[in-house]
């Protein structure tokens, strides 16, 4: 996963088990999943508090709360250093199993990863022994070529499974930062997922236009571009994934 297609306009690599991240969704039926195409929150009416309008909050203030809601993370002014929830808060057993990124204009697949099957994981654990990293699966590191920063729309397809509980109002908020500057906020509704289902969604990233100076700095400073992906069920934070990015691949 280190830019295996040298002819691609922008290649990517990932290190680590892979916290999966994303944008607009297309759900298609797979093992009981829901078939639907959902748009990002833009003009849809919603409560004013959900806009994140108000004084900025700190990570420490959110960690002190019993329940973290969408309006809280929308008021963060910088990327988090810690996880805002525990793995065991995912009481719905939502598990991301496959991830693919493609350039929507050309259809070129830039990156693809799949989670090992259960038998492979058990074999690795037996061979490795020792303590299990509780953050495994919550962080991913990407390396793209500089050309990635000039793409306009990228599709990120994710496949995920749901446990034996129904999942209602499943929502993701993903915030991308370069250093202390918020580049883009993505906000998407997955809607309802039936129990014991396998769901596939394509999230469409519409990237902001960046100045040449910002692009140069992002290329020259790998992994200073970072993101938080917050997942909510019924407006309660249940999962938090993190990622960082380099844009100097192939150099």
UniProtKB/Swiss-Prot annotation:
The keyword Protein transport applies. The modification N-acetylserine is found at residue 2. InterPro entries: Ig_E-set, PDE6D_unc-119_myristoyl-bd, PDED_dom, PDED_dom_sf. The modification N6-acetyllysine is found at residue 24. Changing residue 144 to A: Reduced binding to myristoylated proteins. Changing residue 207 to A: Reduced binding to myristoylated proteins. GO terms for cellular component: ciliary transition zone; cilium; cytosol. GO terms for biological process: cilium assembly; lipoprotein transport; nervous system development. It holds the Pfam family GMP_PDE_delta. It is found in: Cell projection, Cilium. Tetradecanoate binds at residue 142. It comes from the Eukaryota. GO terms for molecular function: lipid binding. Found in a complex with ARL3, RP2 and UNC119B; RP2 induces hydrolysis of GTP ARL3 in the complex, leading to the release of UNC119B. Interacts with NPHP3 (when myristoylated). Interacts with CYS1 (when myristoylated). Interacts with MACIR; interaction only takes place when UNC119B is not liganded with myristoylated proteins. Belongs to the PDE6D/unc-119 family. This is Protein unc-119 homolog B. It comes from Homo sapiens (Human).
